[in-house]
Amino acid sequence: MKKTGIIKAMLLCKKYEKMSQEQRDELRIQRLHRLVKYARENSPYYSQLYSDLPADFTLQDLPATDKRTLMENWDDWVCDDSLKLADVEKFMGNPDNIGAFFNKKYMVITTSGSTGNPLVAVLDKTANNIMGGISASRSYARKQDLKAFMKNGKKTMAVFADGGFYLGNSSVRSRLKTMPWKKKQMGVSSALYPMEDIVKQLNDFQPAMLGGYPSHLELLAEEAQKGRLNISPVVIMTGGEYLSDNVRKKLADTFNCYVQTSYSCTEGGAVACECTNQHFHINDDWLIVEPVDANGNPVPDGVLSDKILLTNLYNYTQPFIRYEVTDRVIMHHEACGCGNPSPWIELEGRTDDITAFVQDDKVIKIAPLAIYAVLKEVHSLRRFQVLVCSENRVEMRIEQMDNCDRLVTFEQASAHLKNFLATQGITDVNVILSDTLPQQHPVSGKFKHVVNMQNI
């Protein structure tokens, strides 16, 4: 793919929005064929996978791929033979490298690892710029919010897990490393900090745009209602979790601003942007989303899928082509009242619970992604589920990785959790190992990593 700067990427996004449906479909096919051709010529893995692929192939002719297989073949998967997973993992061993460019060429990002070992991904500068172009062109559902953001100093602060090479964290850190003068306009607060520290940072920074996980922002709304948090954002953008109608209204009423969300993932960046009708419109000039059932068969519009197959049309260094993502969506092609002709999806998001502990007669609430971010660092854990019960009793359901001792894994996870809770002022906690493995809800079929078992 030709080198593309962020301005050109923005122009390409705007140009696409003016195309007819026929032109859009043709562009998507061209980009898919160019990507597949490049992957066959530069990736040993794809060269073998596509060895019998006809020249006039369609999207459905391409075999599906998945994280486990691609990670097992990482060195052959990428299209730059100088890239080696061992070198990238060594680079990731230094947290100072978050947001830095590996070999001065690639930003390194990783998934959260909710379904086993995390994916390690690399983005060249063109891929970074296209992600930035999509964000700059389509992030704001309402033009007046963008204007208000610009008018109020363009100051942004996000609250999320900042200790890893995650997409949001790495992207912000990268911008701050390359443009250090942006520090007065862009900030990050860790979701792992005690709430009073986050509140102080936000009060000092006074962001015009506030971002973060819905569950954490809900706790910040309570801080504002109690008079401790005093900020006036013009827009709130959430991500990483499902944004319920109740939380959306609570945030809007508390901060007196518009609240919106988006659908992003490590493999595809901003997959879909929310419109004023709260529909997630797919950025289908750069990404292809296929809803499928458990066996990989197409799911019709209006039906909840078991997963999706995602094709990223702009990452040439590490092609994600019909890549399995375990998010469940409902696809729509009917017209949306906002005027955006791109298909839109309903997304079944994460539904983990806010929990609460009591220390010295004080109730301390904890956002679920804070607990999740701590425990995913225990690499011997394949899956986990934390049940928070009354009297600060925590039941931990775990599934350890192959060749790892179950009791040792639990002790590591328990220590990580207790150390984190201590930073929140919670020291009286009893963590026990459950005989039960992590499991879905017997009725809804939904899986929660963090489950509240008490009334709060």
Regions found by a protein language model. Name each.
Residues T126-S135, K155-H216:
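AMP-binding/adenylate-forming
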Residues M1-T110, N117-S137, Q144-K151, D204-G211, ...:
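Nucleotide 5′-phosphate-binding alpha/beta core
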